[in-house]
């Protein structure tokens, strides 16, 4: 894995129980919580300066997961917060300023830019959320562009089936974080120590 300091001297803070794939890239003012999984080829960059040279933080809270090929970045002086237990699926882009609540699911190849998502929001695949605030517990359908409140009028609450799916994804990735963390710290490939 590539872990780098940014131009401002900010070094990533990574919890000992986080699991990072060897091909992940983490740069600058990034905080990664415990039991977080960072998948192959994920890029998390907090390196774009504001006019005064400061760099906003990217914060990934406990039990979140950043899957294969995800990019997380922010405009100069802004940040990104990924809430506890949130899944950012393969190929998604989260660009700050953005905040994603707890226990959310962001689907494959979706883009979140200058947006705020409440807790329990599920964004299905290839959606675009830009300059919008999504309230708690709604589903954004696949291939949907969301740019204002009118776009949200057609969104349904999260169904029990989708909530169960999001929980399963979270649980699977917490397991992957545990295994990756174990391999990183001991060189062993399973929890029994073999």
Residue map of PLM features:
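N-terminal segments that cap or nucleate solenoid repeat domains
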Residues: 1-41
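Glycine-rich hexapeptide-repeat left-handed beta-helix
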Residues: 2-13, 41, 45-47, 51-57, ...
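Glycine/small-residue-rich phosphate/adenosyl-binding loop
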Residues: 65
């Amino acid at each position: 894995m590539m872990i780098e300091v940014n131009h401002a001297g900010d070094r990533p803070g990574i919890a000992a129980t986080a699991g990072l794939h060897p091909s992940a890239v983490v740069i600058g003012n990034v905080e990664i919580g415990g039991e977080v999984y960072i998948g192959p080829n994920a890029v998390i960059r907090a390196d774009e300066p504001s006019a005064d040279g400061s760099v906003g933080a990217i914060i990934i809270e406990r039990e979140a997961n950043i899957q294969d090929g995800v990019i997380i970045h922010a405009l100069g002086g802004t940040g990104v917060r990924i809430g506890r237990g949130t899944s950012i699926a393969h190929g998604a882009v989260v660009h700050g300023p953005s905040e994603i609540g707890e226990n959310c699911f962001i689907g494959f190849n979706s883009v979140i830019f200058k947006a705020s998502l409440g807790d329990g929001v599920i964004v299905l695949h290839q959606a675009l959320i830009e300059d919008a605030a999504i309230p708690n517990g709604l589903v954004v359908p696949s291939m949907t562009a969301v740019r204002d409140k009118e776009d949200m009028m057609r969104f349904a609450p999260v169904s029990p089936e989708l909530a169960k799916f999001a929980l399963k994804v979270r649980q699977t990735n917490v397991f992957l974080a545990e295994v990756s963390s174990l391999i990183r710290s001991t060189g062993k490939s399973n929890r029994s120590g073999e």
